[in-house]
Amino acid sequence: MDRPVLRLYHPRMKVRYGKSRLICKGFVLLLFSLQAMSTPVPTTLPDCPDRPNCVSSLSSDPAHAIEPLAYTGTARDAMRRLKQALRAEKRVTIVTEQDTYLHIEARSLVFRFVDDVEFLIDPAHNLIQVRSAARTGYSDLGVNRRRVERIRRAFIQAQ
């Protein structure tokens, strides 16, 4: 016994669409619409927790405070120089990249701990705000502060 095939007709085009073709076209349309809904660009960076495993240029707490990266030129040039400086870092993966925001993950060599490092370009003040924080543990023994200072030196040297 043959099952009836569902055929849908477009009233103007008189084209037959099978059920599977209609589902595929709907899926493609969904993918394109999801791509258009991009993640909003952050306007600030999260605060550091009360643990000594984080540094941030936006922190008012001296234990967590670190200077932002200063730049001259355009925000686009600053992002290019920043990515060039990050190439010198080992075990770094870019997670999110937008025009004025960059989020990377840095892994430790031995235990593979993950640290989140975020950069937010402030074109009004020619600064790159930075936050580097360990995801786990209480203290990072200054690893995040040293990482940001290494990135700062590489950023200054990058052309």
Regions from the PLM with identified roles:
Residues K14-F27:
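Bacterial N-terminal signal peptides that target proteins for export
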Residues V5-L6, L31:
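A composition/secondary-structure signal for short, hydrophobic, low-basic-content segments
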Residues A36-Q159:
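Ser/Thr-rich, low-complexity intrinsically disordered terminal regions
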Residues L29-M37:
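Hydrophobic h-region of N-terminal signal peptides that target proteins for export
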Residues D2-V5, V15:
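Acidic, Ala/Val/Gly-enriched low-complexity intrinsically disordered segments
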